[in-house]
Amino acid sequence: MSEANRPAESKDPYLSRRTMATSPLPSAREIAAQIRKKEISPVEVARLHLDRIERFNPSLNAFVDWKPEAVLAQARAAEKAILQGDDVGPLHGVPLSIKASIDVAGHRSEAGTRLRAGYMAAEDAPLVARLRTAGAVILGVTNTPELLMAWETDNLLYGRTNNPWDLTRTAGGSSGGEAAAIAAGLSAGGVGSDGGGSIREPAHFCGICGLKPTPGRIPSTGHFPKSGGPFALLGVVGPMARTVGDVQVLFETMAGWDDGDPSAAPVDVRPIQEKTMRDVAVGFFEDDGRTPVTQETRSAVQGAVSLLSNAGFRVDPFRPEGLEEARQLWWKFFGTAGGMIQGPMLRGHESELSPILREFYSWTAAEPVHSGQSLLATWLGRDEVREKILVQMRKYPVLICPTAAIPAFRHGEREWLIEGKTVKYLDAWSYCEWFNLLGFPAVVIPITVSPEGLPIGVQIVGRPWAEEMVLAIAAALEEGRGPWAGPPIEHA
């Protein structure tokens, strides 16, 4: 990066020593620690992130609504609390972003559709309120595909979000705005949602970490579309950040029961003891036997296995039976049932929909419409395959596998030739969809970079309610991997 393009360094001693233009970017926990020690001001941190939004958002198109004066007002209040010696939370003064399908008071909550254009949230979703209670400064909201129905982020309201590693490629979807903002240092962390890979795939594409929790572990109250029916089995909200430790802090802050979400469960956060973690056998597979993956994706899984083995973990080849059945059942829930649920909202407005959403609904239209009997059969089928895989995972309660068949793809691509086989758009993401259908927690962590300079992540998957375990394994993997540099700043 040329000196002419380098952002001016702050006079603050912390920022002079390690500016956010260098890699790796500071973690949310590091920022919070420096604020508590009075080595950096919350106002300075907020200004720095606002400067980065101003500089990089025009090329990334990650943020769609942010209010600098409101951000600075939050930061001044955080600074006052520090100067007064008040007790502060674990995220005090840390700037976070929120996906624009989750309510943030005074901000747009449009879910990328013209049918909700101009909709402003009147109050914070409970998870946002919990982040504020922990001291977070909310920067604003980030871009999504229309109605969250795509694995890339583009819509007719705000346009396309680009990947900070390569602007000609997608940041993923549907939490693509979040992933791009966090990877490029516009935000220190944030919140996405995931009904079929929408946290994990953007995290994989952008080289950050993201957790899809068990349904009900974090309340989805205040999210649009609302969680209910089949969606309550699949869709969740979850944390995204640059490090596993940051993901864990965000998870612990947001987790807990809320009466606005019928699926929310009062499950306490349970720390994992080192011996308990070390006693767990980890299974891994490089592909599912149906959809091939790129060589660099295989290498990422192999690298993760080597790192854990070198750290003393038992890691064995293991691919549970029933994954293809889970994929087909996911589509019957998410695609067919989703189309039925959202159909009344969309009917008569087809001309106002984005090309990507029209494409998605053309795929769902090819499937038989659910009757009450077929929906019940699908529901029962889900329970049966879930039991089948859970029994197999008694020996290997933690799995490592690819996140997707490919790294971030070029805008508009719809198929890829992998190992002599054409992989279609809908098939490339099956590695995420299984675990939505099954309700298993899964965290993505970047492991390596492809020959084209694109990040490659892996998934660490556990049994229901085992978020603490998958995060502990991910943290051990992160420690073995070492610091992650993030995207070249000139690409942002």
Predicted regions and their residues:
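An N-terminal boundary/leader segment
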Residues: E3, D12-A73, N310-G312, G486-A492
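Glycine-rich, small-residue loops and helix-cap segments
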Residues: K38, H49, G93, T133, ...
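Residue-level signal for inorganic ion chemistry
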Residues: H49, V71, V247, V282, ...
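Acidic/His- and Gly-rich active-site-bordering loop/insert found
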Residues: A81-L156
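Short helix-loop capping/hinge segments that flank enzyme active sites or metal/cofactor-binding pockets
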Residues: L91-A111, E274-F285, F333-L390, P402, ...
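Short glycine/serine-rich loop segments
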Residues: E123-M254, N436-G457
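A short helix-breaking turn/cap at a secondary-structure junction
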Residues: K212-G303, G322, P344, A475, ...
